[in-house]
Design a protein with these regions (language model features):
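C-terminal ends and interior cores of transmembrane alpha-helices
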Residues: 92-123
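Intracellular loop-helix junctions on the cytosolic face of multi-pass helical membrane proteins
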Residues: 1-20, 156, 184-247
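Central cavity-lining transmembrane alpha-helices of secondary-active solute carriers
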Residues: 63-82, 98, 143, 177-179, ...
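Cytoplasmic loop-to-transmembrane helix junctions
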Residues: 20, 24, 57-58, 92, ...
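Short amphipathic helix-loop junctions that connect adjacent transmembrane helices
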Residues: 41-61
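A gly/Pro-rich, aromatic-decorated transmembrane alpha-helix motif that marks the paired
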Residues: 40-41, 74-78, 106, 174-189
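Cytoplasmic membrane-interface "Motif A"-like loop-to-helix N-cap segments
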Residues: 82-98, 158
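Cytosolic juxtamembrane N-terminal segment immediately preceding the first transmembrane helix
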Residues: 1-33, 37, 112-126
């Protein structure tokens, strides 16, 4: 009877033949990619037109940003594997991404060029660099772990796993396709803040979706040792919050 009850419980947590957790990850990643590619579509134009970077300096910054974005998931995955767990890592990454994208929407004064001398708003640039750093860290924590959660939703050798990942990657493509058009159009038509703000709102929608739907992850994304996370490492600060602060 217990096996039958367990099977019935598992089936009640499915939708269209897949775990409901897949759709939670689908929409979370769709909105994360919406925000990521929406911001990326504007970045070079923002640097060269608003802050008057040269093309070379703009490409150099984007190259450094791209390199760090693809390097940080190694660290984010390791931290989640050893301490945080995938669920907490995705939430933390989502919060960083929301803050980073909304920070990008804060406009200062556009740069000016007089006699070949470029004057830039130093405070606006500081906010920009800090926001970019938040996005890099956010991607590092969210991207590798949400993909791993999808795999954990299926038992070993489950024939549905391949189609589940196909659906998941379809969400990535949908988010990337829509954002490049929408955020680019908003940025060019109404101002940079509108384009970056739309990317931030998209990520906020993804984070809200994940937080509300995390009950469908079937406990597969929890910390490996919850008690260790609650240990105090200095003063009242627990290991979990020490990780957040260190990031």
């Amino acid at each position: 009877m217990s096996a039958i009850a367990a099977d019935a419980s598992a089936r009640s947590d499915e939708l269209f033949g897949h775990p409901k957790g897949l759709y939670v990850c689908f929409f979370t990643e769709m909105w994360e990619r919406f925000s990521f590619y929406g911001m990326k579509a504007l970045l070079l134009l923002y640097l060269t037109k608003y802050h008057l970077f040269s093309d070379d300096n703009g490409y150099n910054l984007i190259g450094a940003y791209g390199g760090l974005v693809y390097a940080m998931p190694v660290i984010g995955g390791l931290v989640a594997d050893r301490w945080l767990g995938m669920r907490k890592a995705v939430v933390f990454g989502g919060v960083l991404l929301v803050l980073g994208h909304l920070g990008m929407a804060i406009e200062g004064h556009p740069a000016s060029s007089v006699g070949g001398v470029v004057t830039r708003d130093a405070r606006a640039l500081q906010v920009f660099y800090f926001s970019l750093a938040l996005i890099i860290m956010g991607v590092g924590f969210l991207k590798p772990n949400i993909s791993t959660i999808v795999g954990k939703l299926y038992v070993e050798n489950d024939p549905r796993r391949d189609s589940g990942f196909s659906l998941f990657y379809a969400g990535i493509n949908i988010g990337a396709t829509i954002s490049g058009v929408l955020c680019g159009w908003l940025g060019e038509t109404y101002g940079w803040g509108w384009g970056f703000g739309a990317a931030g709102i998209g990520m906020l929608a993804g984070l809200a979706n994940f937080v509300m739907g995390q009950k469908h992850l079937r406990g597969h994304a929890e910390p490996p040792d919850a008690a260790r996370l609650r240990e105090r490492v200095f003063g009242p600060v627990t290991r979990e919050y020490a990780i957040y602060l260190a990031a």
